[in-house]
């Protein structure tokens, strides 16, 4: 899915006090750019919605998302699809993914995700994790009273792009867009 997920549920009528967990929790994504000038005035280490860069400069990007309650899933697919303006050149080697809580930060190993450049549909790149649930369950093994794992961890994907010479062809333009879409498992009964 790419937005919300919903499931039908069967209610246990033999036990009128049974708890029913509605699985409509889904991840969201926020995109930020790290402004290199004026970090002190911007705050948040310069992470902002816009940035001012010169041709040839490295432009740091960050996608922030979250792990929803995925206890009903055996596996959980997670992928970011990005469409960059042609004035930006993507650096696939710069991709880093962190899963974190207030107490712990885990950086995914390069073999735990895949970077696909020019995957089709006009996209510049796609970064996918085949089973982020297995990683979170292994690295953040926190159980609740029902012996289910506790989710809600932040997922942060960082990468760099370079403002290339194509930016000079359109200097009066207000900005160079970079759009992201998050794809994730939306059916707990299907791997």
Set out the residue ranges of the language-model regions.
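Serine/threonine-rich, low-complexity linker/repeat segments that form flexible spacers/stalks
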Residues: 8-72, 81, 177-182, 186-191
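Short structured motifs
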Residues: 42-49, 65-67, 126-145
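Hydrophobic beta-strand residues in large extracellular and virion-surface proteins
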Residues: 20, 63, 95-99, 115, ...
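A short beta-turn/strand-edge loop motif at beta-sheet boundaries
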Residues: 70-74, 88-91
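Short, acidic/polar linear motifs in exposed loop/turn regions
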Residues: 69-71, 84, 165-167
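A surface/secretory-pathway sequence property marking extracellular, secreted
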Residues: 79-127
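Serine/threonine-enriched low-complexity regions used as flexible
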Residues: 1-14, 63, 76, 139-191
């Amino acid at each position: 899915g790419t937005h919300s997920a919903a499931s039908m549920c069967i209610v246990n009528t033999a036990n009128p006090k049974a708890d029913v967990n509605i699985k409509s929790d889904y991840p969201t994504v926020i995109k930020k750019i790290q402004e290199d000038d004026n970090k002190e005035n911007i705050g948040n280490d310069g992470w902002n919605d816009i940035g001012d860069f010169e041709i040839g400069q490295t432009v740091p990007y960050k996608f922030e998302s979250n792990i929803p309650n995925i206890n009903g899933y055996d596996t959980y697919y997670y992928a970011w699809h990005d469409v960059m303006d042609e004035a930006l050149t993507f650096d696939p080697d710069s991709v880093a993914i962190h899963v974190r809580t207030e107490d712990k930060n885990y950086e995914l190993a390069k073999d735990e995700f895949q970077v696909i450049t020019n995957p089709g549909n006009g996209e510049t790149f796609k970064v996918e994790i085949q089973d982020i649930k297995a990683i979170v369950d292994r690295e953040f093994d926190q159980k609740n009273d029902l012996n289910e794992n506790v989710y809600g961890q932040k997922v942060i994907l960082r990468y760099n792009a370079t403002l290339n010479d194509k930016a000079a062809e359109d200097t009066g333009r207000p900005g160079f867009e970079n759009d992201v879409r998050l794809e994730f498992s939306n059916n707990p009964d299907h791997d």
